[in-house]
Amino acid sequence: MNSQSGTRNYGPDKARDFAQQLVKEANASLESNRKMWLPPQNQTPVLPIYYQYVIATSTGYEADQGVYCHHNDEHYFFVSRGRNKNNYNRSVIRKYAVGSDSILNIFIMPHHPDSIQSSNYDVTSAGIALGASVKLSGIYETGKKPWQFKGLLNHEIGHVLGLRHTWSGNDGCEDTPNHPNCWNREKTAPCDTAASNNLMDYNANQHAWTPCQVGKIQMNMANLHSLSRKLLEENWCRLDESKTIEIQDSVVWNGSKDLQGHLVIAPGAVLRVRCRLSFPIGASLIVKAGGHLILDRARLHNACGDHWNGIMVESKGRHEGQITFRGDCSVEDTIW
């Protein structure tokens, strides 16, 4: 967002370069989850984070390459504090959001020029998540590099994906302890030992996701009715045989999954499914001779409005695959 004069934010070329680099830096953080600092001497596992951002184009706006520059003196500014703050004002979103039913919109907005001139107003970076949109400020005025805002972007998108602040109250995760919300580690107490590096705190690092936070994000993405899911690229609709999963041990699946390949239960293996599973068109669930599939209040279907092959039970000599149904189960959208 920029003023009508075009002097309050980056021009088109610089804006596009900045946005692309910011997304690249934020994705790099997603690829390199770090160990939690809190609690001290913790044994919290460091899990991979299985999502990345893609700058999306919308039909009719392909030439903009997913980065749009708007000039509007009424809507371009962000006031993060004071009696005239407009953090929760959605007017800019209502006017300029593109494809908000399936695209996460990031609005980079400068502070109001009157705010900047006030000696009591700190020109700092700030952000807020509002539904499927995020408003960020302090990007242009501070003159910082894109990598310096990757934590801010990941933090606000974390809210969109269902995460809450962790330093006080209950965020729904036992592995994110409360703390005094230090900005960084210091030599004096309490910030010598109580500083956090978690994504959802206000701190100088914001590069650690806990197992619970990763799980909450994945759970929301797998929820057929969630906001998070509407923002995903549907890469589970086409069969990719390289993504075939073979179960070779005793495994229980409790959380919904959208598979991209076949599912094979090897001889001697047991898979207990207690959730929703989606299979792409052309995919099969193969129970090898000696394998055992337990459907425990499970739903097997195709989440793309199409069909999948269904369940194949193989036999070999005196051995054959087994299927056990427990509770209310459904196998839908099969061609067999």
Task: List PLM regions with ranges.
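Active-site-proximal segment of zinc-dependent metalloprotease catalytic domains
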Residues: 81-168
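Pan-zinc metallopeptidase signature
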Residues: 212-242
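The catalytic-center signature of Zn2+-dependent metalloproteases
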Residues: 134, 138-211
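Sec-exported extracytoplasmic/periplasmic mature domains
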Residues: 24-35, 159-166, 222, 226
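Propeptide-to-catalytic entry region of secreted or membrane-anchored zinc metalloproteases
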Residues: 1-97
